[in-house]
Amino acid sequence: MDRDILYIEMYKLFKRRRAWIGPVLVFLLIIISFPLTLDINSDNPPQIYLSFIWISTLLVTMLGTELIFSDDFEDGTLEQYAVNDQLIEVVFYKILVHWVLIGIPLAFVAFLFILSLNISIQISSIALLCLIISNLIFINFFSLGNALSLKKGSILGLLITIPFLIPVLIVLGKMTTSALLGLSLVGHLSLLVGVMILVASFIPFVISFILRTHLE
Amino acid sequence: MIKKFFHQFASPKSYFAIANKFGKPVLAFFFLLYIGALVWGLFFTPPDVVQGDSYRIIYMHVPASFMAQILFVVMAITSAVFLIWKLKLAAYVSKSIAPIGAIVTFFALFSGSIWGIPTWGTWWQWDARITSTLILFIMYLGLISLHASFENKDKADKFFSVLVLIGVVNIPVIKKSVDWWSTLHQSASITLTSKPAIDPVMLYPLMFSIVAFIGLIFGLVILSSQNEILKREKYKSWVKNI
């Protein structure tokens, strides 16, 4: 594993401030619009807000990974890596960097919002953990979708990848209900972690296969 | 000898010749068989005690929902064959399955909705089976649009096959996860699984219609794959000589 690639990728994304601050701000705007459209002081169950948060993080991580490969594809950087046989590492590090700079900040913004709803600190921290884990899964799959739909627009990528993410959404929804009922979450959480490990170790290979096919 | 047979059969040219000879008779045979099954089911079986005559749509709904999933699995097998052995024919076949699968899945959803109105009192219920079928339908549409969006069809075949393989892993997962989700939210009164065992008088025409429908759909797949071969290999000399 070449550590330099990680630093380069980190630097490249960090320099493009709009690419990682932008999604977080968009997410903040979406979150601000919840209290405007739903009466936050009424007795709506907290689950409603949590499910809104799952769905909006799904969409915002999609926005955040929209340009994950296209710039490097256009200027030939990916081809260089492919020649050096480092494509898998690049894909892996790109996903990691996007998770650190977009996925985790989104999770913390959502955590602040959940705290503001007077939901107990235990449930909020579990939700934070779930968001951090599930954002990695989302980013992996959306990178796959964006690798497939390079130069074709992101609607195609969304259309293809959201069906794959539905099980994750269902597990998240099930977790929130059990958390609010006070049931144990160890089973769901370990399932989510397992899915994360599987996805994060398997999808980069698929993505590098797809990118190699693009470069042929 | 077997190897030689496979090599011959796997070339689009000889497949086309064989399909040209047998495709249409097979399709016609299963079409008539399916019509026969429908006639048997619609006119020669007694009405259901609870559902009356409305249950008779079972002879269209059950084969369609069955095929909706089988076609995806078949598509995954042909895609795997394409990715592993680089057989172009397999890619053509799996590409031509996708639209048929989408139509069959839509038909399953549609007939289910029609059946739901008299029996459940609603045309849609967010339960496990219906939701997973709807996701399946959207997956078919996504695959079709993915294949259509690439000018370079060889690339499109590869992406399509990779995605089908990820999708087929996902199908049981979706089914299972939707099951968990619905067991929490919904009483079991309206699930199809808890229906009492079906009477032989209705079971035999049902089996008959399922078999006939499988044959009918595979006949259609053969015809549609022939079409795809002609489209993709139109610059080859053997196609020009037809």
Label every model-predicted segment:
Chain A
Residues I121, C130-I162, L215-E216:
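A structural motif at transmembrane helix-loop-helix junctions in multipass membrane proteins
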Residues G145-L191, V195-I197:
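Transmembrane helix segments
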Residues Y49-E66:
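Long, hydrophobic alpha-helical segments
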Residues M1-P23:
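Aromatic- and glycine-rich beta-strand/loop motifs that create alpha-glucan
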Residues A200-E216:
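Junction motif at the cytosolic side of a transmembrane helix
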Residues Q80-I88:
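Short helix-to-coil transition segments within interhelical loops
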Residues L87-I114:
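Selective transmembrane-helix segments that form parts of the transport pathway or gating/packing helices
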Residues L13, M62-Q80:
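Transmembrane helix boundary and interhelical loop/hinge segments in multi-pass membrane proteins
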